[in-house]
Amino acid sequence: MAEKMLSLIIPVYYEEEVLMESYRRMDAAMRATGHPYEIIYVNDGSRDGTMKQLRTLAKEHPDTVRVYSFSRNFGHQLAVTCGMDHAKGDALIIIDVDLQDPPELIPKMVEMWKDGADIVYGKRLKRKGETVFKKLTAKIYYRLLSSMSAYPIPLDTGDFRLLDRKVADVFLKMREQARFLRGMSAWMGFEAVPLEYVREERAAGKTKYTLKKMIKLACDGIFNSAS
């Protein structure tokens, strides 16, 4: 039987300060799983040096690194969807490039998947380096979302997760423009297990989630999940 393959999907938007260090840690984590793997970067319209660095990585690591690029900024959720559309793996792992979600947790996620989980989602026990305002609004948002949803959505989670291929295939059949991965994952009803962790501070640079983008994501989540 052929060994199962893993796809790591990383949306990128103006991340030249952290990209190369992030790649080193991501690649080390994927190698530690012992599985064949691919790392898929989706450039979400960056206009700094991000794309140049991505081209360098693809040229230096042609067997494992693949790069796709949008003509403009379409948003995090559509960038993730693009990566999923092109992924070949038996399991798909979604992670942000900024190293707040430690790549070193990936081998543990893979082990939980091999033990039977269809979805392994990161559950944040603590959020380092975030302002009181950000922590408070996040807490209010997740509880509001949970109270309005027609189905249970785990609290204090983001898009850091592993999806079995069958889960990804169902997700990709749903082509809504306003996408909300964590809610859609919960709605599908597959076996999902949490992996608890402490979310780190950003390794470099600033968050690209402006207040406007956060409000839009919140609205998408509430409208997609409400009964």
Tell what function each PLM region has.
Residues 1-131:
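Structured catalytic core of nucleotide-sugar glycosyltransferases
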Residues 190-192, 198:
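Histidine/lysine/aspartate-rich catalytic loop segments that bind and position anionic ligands
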